[in-house]
Amino acid sequence: MMEGSRQTRVSRPYKISESSKVYRWAEHSGTVLQRLNEQRLRGLFCDVVLVADEQRLPAHRNLLAVCSDYFNSMFTLGMREAFQKEVELIGASYIGLKAVVDFLYGGELVLDGGNIDYVLETAHLLQIWTAVDFCCEYLEQEVSEDNYLYLQELASIYSLKRLDAFIDSFILSRFGTLSFTPAFLQNISMQKLCAYLGSSEVQRECEHDLLQAALQWLTQQPEREAHAYQVLENIHFPLIPKNDLLHRVKPAVCSLLPREANCEGFIEEAVRYHNSLAAQPVMQTKRTALRTTQECLLFVGGEVSERCLELSDDTCYLDAQSEQWVKETPLPARRSHHCVAVLGGFIFIAGGSFSRDNGGDAASNLLYRYDPRCKQWIKVASMNQRRVDFYLASIEDMLVAVGGRNENGALSSVETYSPKTDSWSYVAGLPRFTYGHAGTIYKDFVYISGGHDYQIGPYRKNLLCYDHRTDVWEERRPMSTARGWHSMCSLGDSIYSIGGSDDSLESMERFDVLGVEAYSPQCNQWTRVAPLLHANSESGVAVWEGRIYILGGYSWENTAFSKTVQVYDRDKDKWSEGTELPKAIAGVSACVCALKPRLEDKKKKGKGKRPQDHGQ
C-alpha cells in the first residue's frame, strides 16, 4: 500500500454473517423530547412564539403540529399564522397555555384547583385531547353533591362526553337524595330529567319516589307543565300497586297537572295492566319493565339428595359479584322434574312431580307464574294433562308443553298456553309417545330430541322440529348418539344436545352419556364438540352471558346427585366448573330472567363507576 493513502475497508480475517439485525434505542423518544425541551427553555432553534395574556412562550412549530390538530391546521393550510414569528392565541390564558405546552414537551400535566379551568379551556381550544382526557379524570375525582351541577354545565360547554357520563352515573346513584334538593329541582334540564327517569340505573326506594321527583320538578315553574307528558312517560306506573295508583297517584296527578297534559292515560293504562293479571306477560311495554340492565341465572325446585328434604321449593339466582347463590321467593309447592320457561319477563313453572317417585303417578298439571316485579308466585290455568319429564317452550306470546308422561303412561300430546285467555289448547301431537326428551327454541321453531317412547327399550336419536305457524312436526337428521334425560339449548347458530343417559342393549343397565353434539339447522348436520366433565342426567340448563350452564344432575353409574355447575365456552370448545349449587340436586330446572335488584345492590353498583369513553 502506498504511503499516505487511506485504508477504506478493514480487512476481515474471519467471515461475518451478512444477515441484518435491528437494534432499538429504547430511550430515544424520551431523550429527544427532553433535549427539545431544554432547547425551548434556552430559546434555541425555536421558530414560533405563542402569546397569551400578553405573555410569551417560545416553541417549535414541528412539535406543536405533531401534537395538536389545531396547530397542524394553522401551520400547514396556508393560514397567515404559518408565516408569523408570533402567534396570539385568542381565548387561551397564559396559565393554561404554559401548562399545556409543558405537557407537550414533558408528558406531564400538573392539575390543581387553581388551574384546572384554564388548562381545560386551553387544551380544548388547541384540540389536545389527551390533556382534555386528563382534565376529565381529575374532575371525576372532585365531583361532589356541591359542585356536580357546575361540572355538568362545564361538560356541556366543552362537549365532554366522558365527564358528562360520569356525572350522570353520580346523579343516578344518588337520585333518591339529589332529586329533591332545591338546586336539582331548579337547574336540571328537562332532557336530563327524562334520561334519569327512564334509566334502569336510577336509585330509588320504589317507583312512587320517581313519580314524586317528577311532579316536584314539573311544579317548580309554570312553563314546565307543557313538558308533563314527556316527563311522566318515563315513569313505570304499572310497577306501582293498584291501590296506590287509585288512591294516591291519580289524585296527586289530577290536582297538580292540568287535564290538557293528558297524563291520566298513564294511570289508566297501569290500572288496566293490574286488572288483566293473567295477560300481563303479553302486555309488556317499556313502562312495565323492571329497572335493571342485567338478567340472572336461576334454578327452581328439584329433587335433593339430603334426607327429609326430598323435593325442593327453592328459587335461587346466582349473584355474579359475590359468586353466591341467593334465595328468591320460594315456589308455592315442592316440585321436581318440572319445566320452566320465561315469557314477557315472567317465570312459568309447569307440571313435574310432587313426590320423590317421579314415575308418572305423581305427575302434576299445575302452572305457576312468578312476577319478579313484585316477587310473587300465582297459580294460573292448569294444563289439560298431567305431565312430568316433558318439555316446555316459550315462543312468541304462548307456552308449548310437549310430551312427557303421567299415571297413564307416555304421552304424545302437545298443548299451548295463551296468557291472553289464560287457557290451554291442544295442537298437533308428536308422531310417537315421548318422555325423558329435551328441547329448545331456535328462531321460533321448537326442537326436541331423544327420550323414550315406552318404558322398556333404548333411548332414541330422533330430532323433531315444530313450526307453530303451520302446526306441523317434521323429522330432522337424528343425533349420532341416542340419549334421554339430557339437556338441549340454543347458542349462536347451533343447537346443543348435552349428556344424558342411555340403556345398554345387552344388559339393559343404564349408563351415563358425557358426549355433546351441536346441530346446525342451516346444514341439518350434527358435529361432536367437547364432552361434559361430569354426568348430568336430569339437570337444569340455561344460556347466560354467551355460555351454556348445566346445573346439578344425576349419575346413573355412580347413583349420585350432583351440585356441580358445568360451564361451556363455545369459542374455546371447553367445559369448566362454575359456582357450586347449595345442595346436590337433580330434576331441577334453570332459566335466565331479569329480577328486581336489591336496593343494596343498586347502591353498590352506583358507586365508583368511571366510564372509559374518550374525553371529548
Swiss-Prot record:
Residues 148-250 form the BACK domain. Kelch repeats lie at residues 296-345, 346-397, 398-444, 446-493, 494-546, 547-595. GO terms for biological process: protein ubiquitination. PROSITE patterns: BTB. Residues 46-113 form the BTB domain. Keywords: Kelch repeat, Repeat, Ubl conjugation pathway. Pfam families: BACK, BTB, Kelch_1, Kelch_KLHDC2_KLHL20_DRC7. Pathway: Protein modification; protein ubiquitination. GO terms for molecular function: cullin family protein binding. SUPFAM superfamilies: Kelch motif, POZ domain. Probable substrate-specific adapter of an E3 ubiquitin-protein ligase complex which mediates the ubiquitination and subsequent proteasomal degradation of target proteins. Interacts with CUL3. This is Kelch-like protein 36. It comes from Bos taurus. The gene is KLHL36.
